[in-house]
Structures are given as structure tokens and as C-alpha cells.
Amino acid sequence: MKIVECRVIRPKDRSSVVLATAELLFDNGIRVVNMHLLKPREGQEGNQLRTPVVHTKSGTTLNPFNPSSPEFRAAMHKAVEETLAEAVEAQVNDYTKVFETVEEFRMPVFSRLKLHKFPDNHIPVKAMVSVTVDGELRLNRIAVIKAVDPPAYVVQLPTYTLQSGRRPARDFRFQAEPYEALYKLVTDAYFKVAEVAEDVPVQDAEEPA
């Protein structure tokens, strides 16, 4: 996965522990948002790039997405730092740095799908899914929802609430064609299996032609 562009938004309060919120767009058209570049805590060296965290009802904490390797995390961190440096130099609060120009996004390759299926009852959420993209980015908290009107199965990406109080925004976003590939992968897995042991692939998606 190559980083195509990075956007940073600096807080007006320069004393904040948050240096910037950040989002990254990759060459497969996937955009991850709601990351925070934090000032180092006491005893730490260097700024910290934090991916969003979800607190579940059971008391556990989960990341809607996270890099699959220290190397990819470092690449993400470096891109955010470079973009912030240019924003500071330009004296602007909202800044986007373009790393590569992409005429057409390529299709991502999905692998290591993990699906947990819930009992078939009145609750609309029927399963939760995690999947790895291009071997470098793990996407979590993807829900399979059974809609009633009209009757359909929906593959819903995780959301967070904006501070402005507007409708929830997605933690990561897809282009239309890759989302269709993800939808097919997830729904095929949902109807094939009841539950999959941790870290066991259900299906490796081939790159669509």
C-alpha cells in the first residue's frame, strides 16, 4: 500500500496535547481518518500517532483499524509528521499533502478474514468481521446487519461521532468497487460459516480482474 495523500487539522488551542488530527488516503482508494498525533508524554521520545479506539459494552477496547506491522505504522507516522511540518510552515490549520498522483485507484487484496456470527434473534447485527487489506492494514468492527425495510443484508463500516454533533462519520472509507468486493467476501463468509477461530482465515479474496 502506498500513501497517496495526508490531511492534517491542527487544533486552535496550541497548548493541546493533540498536535493534529490526521487522515490518510492509500493507492487502493481506502481512506483512514480520526487519527491523532500527540505530543510525547513525560519520559517518551517523539510524538505518538494514535489510531482511534472503541470502548465496547463488555469493557474491552478495540481499534477500528490498525497497521499490521511496525514498518507500516512508521510509514503512516512519517507521512503525518511531514504533512504537519508543512502545515506549520504554511501557518494554516487545515492542510493536505499529496505524496503521489493516482489516475485510478487499484483494487485492494483482502485476506485473513475473521467472522464472528451472533445468534439469529431480533438483534439486527448478525456478525462482526475483521479483514486485512494488502497484508498491511487490519480493518475491524465491520458489521453484518439484517435490514428489514427493504429486506437486505448490509455490510456496515464502523463509525464515530463528530464533535460538531452531526451524523456519525466512518473511521475508514472505501471507493465503490472495492466496497462491492468487500461486501461479496463478507456475505459469502457469513452464509458459509457460523464462527471462525481467532486468526484463522475464512477465505482469501483474489484480486478482481
Task: Locate the predicted segments by residue.
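Single-stranded nucleic acid-binding surfaces, predominantly the OB-fold ssDNA-binding core
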Residues: 1-209
